[in-house]
Amino acid sequence: MAEVSAYKDTLNLLQTPFNMRANAPVREPEIQQFWADRQIYETLSRQNPGAPFVLHDGPPYANGALHMGHALNKTLKDIINKYQLLQGRKVRYVPGWDCHGLPIELKVLQELSSEERRNLTPLTLRQKAKAYALAQVEQQSQSFQRYGVWADWDAPYLTLTPEYEAAQIDVFGQMVLKGYIYRGLKPVHWSPSSRTALAEAELEYPDGHTSRSIYVAMPIVQLSEAAQPLLGNYANLALAIWTTTPWTIPANLAVAVNGELTYAVVQAGDCHLIVAAELAESLSKTFATELTVLATFPGSVLEHSRYRHPLYDRESPVVIGGDYITTESGTGLVHTAPGHGQDDFIVGNRYGLEVFCPVDDKGDFTAAVGDRLVGKNVLKDANAAVIEWLTEVGALLKEESYAHRYPYDWRTKKPTIFRATEQWFASVEGFREQALQAIAEVDWIPAQGENRITSMVSERSDWCISRQRTWGVPIPVFYDEESGEALLNAETIAHVRAIVAERGSDAWWELDVADLLPEPYRSNGRRYRKGTDTMDVWFDSGSSWAAVASQREGLHYPADLYLEGSDQHRGWFQSSLLTSVACNGHAPYRRVLTHGFALDEKGRKMSKSLGNVVDPAIVINGGKDQKQEPPYGADVLRLWVSSVDYSSDVPIGKNILKQMADVYRKIRNTARFLLGNLHDFDPAKDALPWEKLPELDRYLLHRLREVILEIQDAFESFQFFRFFQTVQNFCVVDLSNFYLDIGKDRLYISAPDSLRRRSCQTVLAICVEALATAIAPVLSHMAEDIWQSLPYPARTKSVFQAGWVQLQDDWNQPELAAKWQQLRDLRSEVNKVLEQARRDQAIGSSLEAKLQLWVADSDWRAALADRNPADSLSGTAVDDLRYLFLVSQVELRDQPTGLTEAKYHAQTEDWAIAVVDAEGQKCDRCWNYSTTVGQSSEHPDLCDRCVSALQGTF
């Protein structure tokens, strides 16, 4: 409007360098450089006055680009650490990387030609693996830093460094000396594709696995004394077993029954079969033949009966198994091969059965199975060969496909088997009760995590810690060349540990046995060879409490917090717990927090084949097509992390990111408005004391106090989604839609130094500093950007040096808040009627309206009258109803009569509202309508408020 321009320069308009657009790809790295140049994290982590806070980092694997799970995990950690720093605690966060293991070894091997692989020595492989791991660490570190994560990036812990490896050997040594480490032949998860034993954590169970399951008759040759009177009259009596691994039949050494179940003799043609009574009917359908129940009896009577193996000339016993024998599937009788199953091994051990394992490391049958099967691979042609043989001898009752969960090697994506091998184990049985007690003393978030890990530790078998690979920490054992006896004691372990601490674990491959042995063993008349096994990588990372938390300056053990994905209940949480309990009798952590996995917006797992992968690097920096994949910056990603309930799996995708960017912009624009209205304000000179503030300002400080306490509680309880909701609600509902909406009038049109403007600026300054501080743990870059844009001298160089928001007791005004909440509720009703008039184009701006109002409660009516002075220049010029409702005039009525006759109205039994045209003319400066426009000869187009403002009195 042309006439406005005459007075435009007299308005107090927004002035701030704080940009509406974040320009995150440029601005965020600049802010990160600001932190680095001034060593903000380093200074706070060492000089804060509070107690140390240790969040011990679970090491990601040093292989491949970071994915959304990494971003979720590291950002959660950073939010917690930054909040603790703002609370004045010393927070040294040492990031770590898991650097050994098969995936890195395979990566190195894939890059070699067949000629290079043939000539590859263990040391060369290890050198290449180390170089690869270090390169991956550097790449991942740069990505983590781009997320805005603060850490000791220049001094991370790597499981391949000499000091770490030495500490790990220390842990192993302590467990040896306490009798928890032993060597034994035992079935372990074995990967023929990797030719190594695997830990539980290295298995995955993909959908869609189908096995060839078979039912086999095992002919009884001798009944036990208890079974003879019951079953002695049945000819051709056989045990019906079921298995999903036909290749294990040659290794069968027993059939197990459940002593608590009822079994039946059923007639099937001219044969009598023993099955679980409960399954007789379903097995009739499976075998497609009538199974007539002739007798029933308890399973316990079968113990010590004997049967003949269907393929070999050997007899084996019927044994009592455990509660793993059920009637959910199969026949209720379990084929038992102690060399090929955990339960089989335990039962076989109880009955003194041989641990028979006729399968080599490639998965091929050995000569122990006879000429017909030798050399066949158990995952390829062995099943068919065994089934063919069983069919020939008439022992096969039925074959059918069976879909079930089956363990695969997590790296090669190929099936595994159970295979008994000579391995090194940690005897969990030796300290299981201590471990369960330690679990109970930890605070688990969410609480169901405790049940999960308790169940896992209760039921787990001993931990196979040896691997037949080159890239890892060696198990420091020597073997007598003649007897094969292991040499592993305090002296030998300490000697190897000292060498590794100085030279790294390469020394195990570089040095001769004589150099690795302590002096007394070099010439004791025996010849030794060094072991070739390395430790399970879970033993590597599971020793980090010893190598890092208990050794690094500024850290402590037990750590205050471990925070990882929920899969780590069977991974790092558990391996760390077991090593710590074995060595020291307690958990390595006081509190454990777990989060779910990042899924797409439809709740599906991310995969390249589905094309639904959300790459954090693209979220931050943008993709090739920046319209389709805009550069949102790290803060939008961090805001997403704060918005989700991470206790379960969390979705992310384009729509969710757009929503986050929208919320981010709202917060940013709120901050910009606050900053822009402080351009001529210096709190040291211009701020008003609390008691001089109008009611509205005191009410807003009450709300600010509530908001900060809610945010603080959200951070303390790790419920970051409450932070997200509270900040968003405060910026949009309390500030933008209410306080700032009302405040524009006094900020823009008042005299610069007037009470009504300075009082508002006092609150804006408090709010903008509080907002910057409160969002800093999450929106770290925006918070710093706000702080650097403060138009007056800031208290500190960085927002993070300012400490947490300091709340004043005076701000707590519950009675005042109740009064203003009532006014806000009424304002919402008024806005509905104004909006109706606006939709009909009866008014453009609400300032074109006059509000007519009646309330039923006489006390409230009187209170409202106090807020509605007849003269614009009297009253507080802040708390008046016209400013609250953003109208030019308010007329209070003693009766509702006539209000409903207005075209735009609303009514309840408690109040009545009508909107009519404002009286007077429009002021060219403030756009309010007033009957005083034209009264000033000097400023004939202005109202009395604006004339006074130009004179410096309003």
From Swiss-Prot:
Binds 1 zinc ion per subunit. Keywords: Aminoacyl-tRNA synthetase, ATP-binding, Cytoplasm, Ligase, Metal-binding, Nucleotide-binding, Protein biosynthesis, Zinc. CDD domains: Anticodon_Ia_Ile_BEm, IleRS_core. Its cofactor is Zn(2+). It holds the Pfam family tRNA-synt_1. PROSITE patterns: AA_TRNA_LIGASE_I. A motif ('HIGH' region) lies at residues 60-70. It is found in: Cytoplasm. L-isoleucyl-5'-AMP binds at residue 564. A motif ('KMSKS' region) lies at residues 605-609. Its EC number is 6.1.1.5. One of its GO terms (molecular function) is zinc ion binding. It catalyses: tRNA(Ile) + L-isoleucine + ATP = L-isoleucyl-tRNA(Ile) + AMP + diphosphate. It comes from the Bacteria. ATP binds at residue 608. Zn(2+) binds at residues 923, 926, 943, 946. GO terms for cellular component: cytoplasm. It is an enzyme of class 6 (ligase). PANTHER family: ISOLEUCINE--TRNA LIGASE, MITOCHONDRIAL, SOLEUCYL-TRNA SYNTHETASE. Monomer. IleRS has two distinct active sites: one for aminoacylation and one for editing. The misactivated valine is translocated from the active site to the editing site, which sterically excludes the correctly activated isoleucine. The single editing site contains two valyl binding pockets, one specific for each substrate (Val-AMP or Val-tRNA(Ile)). Belongs to the class-I aminoacyl-tRNA synthetase family. IleS type 1 subfamily. HAMAP family: Ile_tRNA_synth_type1. Catalyzes the attachment of isoleucine to tRNA(Ile). As IleRS can inadvertently accommodate and process structurally similar amino acids such as valine, to avoid such errors it has two additional distinct tRNA(Ile)-dependent editing activities. One activity is designated as 'pretransfer' editing and involves the hydrolysis of activated Val-AMP. The other activity is designated 'posttransfer' editing and involves deacylation of mischarged Val-tRNA(Ile). This is Isoleucine--tRNA ligase. It comes from Synechococcus sp. (strain ATCC 27144 / PCC 6301 / SAUG 1402/1).
